[in-house]
């Protein structure tokens, strides 16, 4: 496991940081939230839920879907799926054992009530501990920036998707493969400097999905609905000159963007 991932999601427990109120640990999709008024915790939680909803809509789920979430964290998204996606069956997978224990503790009542609809398993995106052809959808929300090998992730996604199943991923990537991008981001953002986030172009993921045999690969920029709201929320704790505020600057300078990437397993 990447040491930065181990520490951030283990002893440091990023979910306890108030910038991630509600425990979803994503930057949020802010389109439906008025950014011209003071933001509160309810807005923040909704932004994170709405990012999941964008991904789930893009997954075009069938009735009673079986869904795998890669990088489930505390499982807040898994619980949202159970409440909003009909009779969904959800497997939440995460590489970090401490995160999985927190997920099981957080959702202990739900696991008792719905033992056949929700489970949490430990596994890496590049080597998923689940059977092939087992899922109608594979989703991932703001985790792919940590994955060490996008090609292996794509191959595993293809392996576990049923014919006609869909993949839907949301995360941030560089806008292109210019050789200077990693250095630019490391100079702006501590999470790239310390190796927690990996600077790669979104096209690398798209090509990996195509190479793994998936069809209809589509890349959509959703940064306009992510970065301004995220920066407004960060401004409650971080001054303009501090490094977290550089996410918006990296977007405005055309270095980094936030994407929704989808693909389908041919029938």
Where is each model-derived feature located?
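N-terminal auxiliary segments of SAM/dcSAM-dependent transferases
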Residues: 1-23
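Conserved alpha-helix/loop element of class I SAM-dependent methyltransferases that forms part
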Residues: 29, 46-63
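Class I SAM-dependent methyltransferase SAM/SAH-binding core
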Residues: 66-127
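A short acidic, Gly/Pro-enriched loop at the edge of an enzyme's catalytic core
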Residues: 126-138
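A short glycine-rich, Lys/Arg-flanked "PGG" loop and its adjoining helix->strand segment in the class I
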Residues: 151-166
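Short, glycine-/aromatic-enriched active-site segment of Class I SAM-dependent methyltransferases
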Residues: 173-195
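Short alpha-helix
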Residues: 197-213
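Conserved catalytic loop of SAM-dependent methyltransferase domains
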Residues: 215-240
């Amino acid at each position: 496991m990447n040491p930065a991932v181990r520490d951030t999601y283990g002893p440091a427990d990023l979910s306890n940081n108030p910038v991630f109120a509600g425990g979803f640990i994503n930057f949020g999709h802010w389109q439906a939230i008025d950014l011209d008024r003071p933001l509160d915790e309810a807005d923040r939680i909704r932004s994170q839920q709405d990012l999941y909803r964008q991904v789930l809509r893009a997954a075009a789920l069938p009735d009673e879907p079986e869904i795998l979430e890669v990088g489930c964290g505390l499982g807040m998204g898994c619980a949202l799926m159970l409440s909003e996606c009909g009779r969904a069956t959800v497997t939440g997978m995460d590489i970090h054992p401490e995160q999985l224990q927190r997920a099981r503790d957080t959702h202990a009542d739900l696991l008792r009530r719905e033992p056949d609809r929700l489970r949490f398993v430990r596994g890496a995106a590049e080597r998923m501990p689940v059977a092939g052809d087992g899922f109608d959808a594979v989703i991932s929300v703001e985790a792919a920036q940590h994955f060490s090998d996008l090609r292996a992730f794509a191959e595993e996604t293809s392996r576990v998707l049923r014919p006609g199943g869909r993949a839907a991923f949301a995360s941030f990537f560089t806008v292109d493969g210019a050789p200077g991008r990693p250095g630019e981001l490391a100079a702006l953002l501590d999470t790239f400097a310390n190796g927690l986030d990996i600077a790669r172009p979104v096209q690398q993921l798209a090509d990996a999905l195509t190479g793994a045999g998936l069809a209809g690969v589509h890349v959509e920029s959703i940064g306009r609905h992510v970065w301004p709201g995220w920066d407004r929320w960060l401004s409650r704790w971080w001054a303009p000159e501090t490094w977290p505020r550089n996410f918006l600057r990296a977007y405005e300078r055309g270095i980094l963007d936030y994407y929704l990437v989808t693909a389908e397993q041919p029938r």
